Amino acid sequence: MVHFCGLLTLHREPVPLKSISVSVNIYEFVAGVSATLNYENEEKVPLEAFFVFPMDEDSAVYSFEALVDGKKIVAELQDKMKARTNYEKAISQGHQAFLLEGDSSSRDVFSCNVGNLQPGSKAAVTLKYVQELPLEADGALRFVLPAVLNPRYQFSGSSKDSCLNVKTPIVPVEDLPYTLSMVATIDSQHGIEKVQSNCPLSPTEYLGEDKTSAQVSLAAGHKFDRDVELLIYYNEVHTPSVVLEMGMPNMKPGHLMGDPSAMVSFYPNIPEDQPSNTCGEFIFLMDRSGSMQSPMSSQDTSQLRIQAAKETLILLLKSLPIGCYFNIYGFGSSYEACFPESVKYTQQTMEEALGRVKLMQADLGGTEILAPLQNIYRGPSIPGHPLQLFVFTDGEVTDTFSVIKEVRINRQKHRCFSFGIGEGTSTSLIKGIARASGGTSEFITGKDRMQSKALRTLKRSLQPVVEDVSLSWHLPPGLSAKMLSPEQTVIFRGQRLISYAQLTGRMPAAETTGEVCLKYTLQGKTFEDKVTFPLQPKPDVNLTIHRLAAKSLLQTKDMGLRETPASDKKDALNLSLESGVISSFTAFIAINKELNKPVQGPLAHRDVPRPILLGASAPLKIKCQSGFRKALHSDRPPSASQPRGELMCYKAKTFQMDDYSLCGLISHKDQHSPGFGENHLVQLIYHQNANGSWDLNEDLAKILGMSLEEIMAAQPAELVDSSGWATILAVIWLHSNGKDLKCEWELLERKAVAWMRAHAGSTMPSVVKAAITFLKSSVDPAIFAF
């Protein structure tokens, strides 16, 4: 049984939410955010307004308050059940009440209730949170203000308590009745090089000649068609550091919020010249739900998500090392593997997989990721070939905690590398499954290329395993560090490591220093990174480091209302209440008891609409029959007894769901493959053999723009094998024509060069020179590393 979230309402009442204003303060790689929701009741009856909105799952929400007609009401964090009861009680007694809570099934969805808003009254509701900023491959710090909340596909057994079960109205982005404004202030002692965004911004205003402080604003008219993303480039981001923050003065020592907290960041300098692994089991789990048929970017419809996915799989298949094992799964409402079980990577198995990939379509309906994951984990392990799982999805799943729990249970068997595709992807799902298994996560939005991010991650997965990772503290006598972050077991080249600790004991006199040492072993060699820091905690009224430390600890214990073990549930509740950071078990409630106007009958309920992006609704192929402003309801949900794999389709008053083939990777509905156009780079890569070589044939000649006869005539006499000549020409063509996308073909080019060295031998320098001359290329022969 499936349910589809979302309702296009026919009601014409004024929407009480008028605007959202956001203030962002970024210091180094931490962001503090204050978001204000401005409400006004233009009706003649008291209202209750309900608003569902997205948040990044790493956000530590620690404050909630309301300003009603000039009066400030500060909320209290309470046990969620108690807060809900108190909210209903306050409303029934004629008081005004405000409730903020996270969704029961996902960390990245929140809801806000404004109860008993009087006619003509205005209310400004402000929530505050802090979060770490992830580091991109090019050195940029990435801040995202989520603005898109896609409908989430719900599978049988999903939590009925989810706020996504509520059919909040959805409207086209151009009809959204409220606005968004944002001002961001950025500070870094290392200097700010530039700030970029996927949305129109005001020109960057530097607040000093040293460029250590800057401010940008979101241009007016944001359409909620994408998340607001800032890419911040500092002059230096790879400096290890320790930030020490003073605890709350009125809190007893020994408590998290009473003791000083430390935030430690390292950038391990792992040597790049280490040989890559040639073993492993690589499973690629690709989303084939209906939403994968939408474009990668709302601003650029040149490539659909499914098309980018197919190109990505081709690149991944060509880049795998000889001797490994692999498989491909497509999933939606059903799933099927390319092979019954993982197979050895050979020319034959690669070609068979490529044939399936070429025919792949976004035709599998919804987004049920749990079933294929369970099937993968049930499979036998291959001795000497550790499992590396690559998950590609637009993340439109409701019960993310169940999926994360499944990954966590099997974390000893594998590493999971996750990719969130498109706007509104669930950060809770994508980050959660990577964190649970020691992998990494990537988000692909705007003009990002799925191909580049996937191949960079494959390169990471092939790195030699870093072992014996440890973090040690050297502190004065009487002072010790209690680690709050999970033990670090995996390190990747180019990755930033962040850990939190609570310093317990007696803080020494001024001008005393401490030291933290990160130690790890790589292929038998021991490496150490050290950072020395002053033992002088600094006060912060927002307790930023303490809140982030609490959030880090909560992420290890809080798995939602249904999935959290009883032992962790109590710890998570107590930690949430002590730190003031919201969790699955707590909610913020504010009550204005000065308002004492008993409600005559039920309050008029107003659900604040949220935007819908065409193509974002998980299993739907949307046909607009009577405009977007009619209600979307199912006349009747599919029967719970409906056989698995049978078409799960029903009529709606506005949208009609088309037939979908729920077969495996090959669609029986559409056997022809969409061509790869004139993209010669993809065509060239497609024709590479599993061992890294190319064959000399008409396909290669067409890509090179020459006749086959010309190419054969130019082959040096000392090179007997025509494949060797073809391979050298292909590699030179890659460097000449695809250098901007080198990160996408770097691994497969390594295979080609290694194959050439083994086959050309001492003739390689002269053959390479002849090929460069023949192609009239300026490529440096050193790329072949004779």
From Swiss-Prot:
Expression across tissues: Expressed at low level in many tissues. Not expressed in 80% of tumor cell lines tested.
Organism: Homo sapiens (Human)
Domain VWFA: 281-462
Segments forming domain VIT: 1-131
Official protein name in the record: von Willebrand factor A domain-containing protein 5A
Region forming the signal peptide: none
GO CC annotation, single: nucleoplasm
Keyword annotations: Tumor suppressor
